[in-house]
Amino acid sequence: MNIIEIENVSKTFERVKIEEGLINSFKSLFKREKVKVTALSDVSFKVKEGKIIGLIGANGAGKSTLMKAMVGLIKPTSGTILVNGFNPHDKKNDFLKSIGVVLGQKNQLWWDLSPYETFLLHKEIYELSDTEFKKNVDELAKNLGVLEILKSPVRNLSLGERMKCELIASILHSPKILFLDEPTIGLDFLAQKNIRNFLKNYCKERNTTVVITSHYFPDIYELCEELIILKNGEVVFNNNFKKIKEEIKSYKYIYLSFENEIDSQDLKKYGEVKESDTFSVTIKVQEKLVNETISSILKEFNVIDYNLTEMSSQDLIEDIYSMESTGVKITV
């Protein structure tokens, strides 16, 4: 069952164009030239219930715009969006009760109140019974390790504690779909890991659908089953993330140090040159060709030293952003 259906969605914004100079600034007070900016262009995809989907792209790719359209904060210029069978922009109560939203740079918690007082407000908004409210708060706070700080003012909490409480506020009503926009932004490594582990277990137990955007790639790499990549407002990749991981595992980096000056162009026949300087080159080759490649290079060049390394998460995301098609093959 598809719980999210996006079909041919586009979104354009109008911006005022202001020319440089005092005279042009004065003219703009009376006549403003407007330009259209395309944030989303003919975006289509479907999400099955219970899946964790990663939505990634460079800054300005359209991730936040698409996320806001899916939760009903903005209306698309054209196309249709169905989330749990609802048009998000209608903001029907049943729809709002079926989603949870965490925006990493926008707080739900009141600065001078305790998280628990915000939870009480959400209890009334989502019409939770006393029993359900207590059960959910106790369970979520225990799993996230924040039981002891629920009644402390938000201003006295660390960033990690606040973000965990933000997460509780968003899922207190047991939503079917959870939208996470940069949920671990600014957090330390341990806090990020704790939130990821919690989300894995929570979503598995409750079959919750999750759409997550993040520039911190371990969030995507460790949580997501499928990946959607946006580039300039368009979907350039929509596929199972496991296939990408398997593809990446089939590559190795070979770092080579040479006795004499080397022209990196001479190494291109052996693999993709990733880095180079006067006396060293790093190339990317398929794992099955590593031994053959090293043997051939040693015969042709005076190599002082070489070593092999795995592709890192950062390497992976750079390769993914450089994909030119919707296939699994990586082409950087």
Regions found by a protein language model. Name each.
Residues 79-89, 95-96:
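Conserved ABC transporter NBD signature motif
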Residues 196-284:
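ABC transporter nucleotide-binding domain
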Residues 178-182:
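Catalytic Walker B motif of ABC-type/P-loop ATPase nucleotide-binding domains
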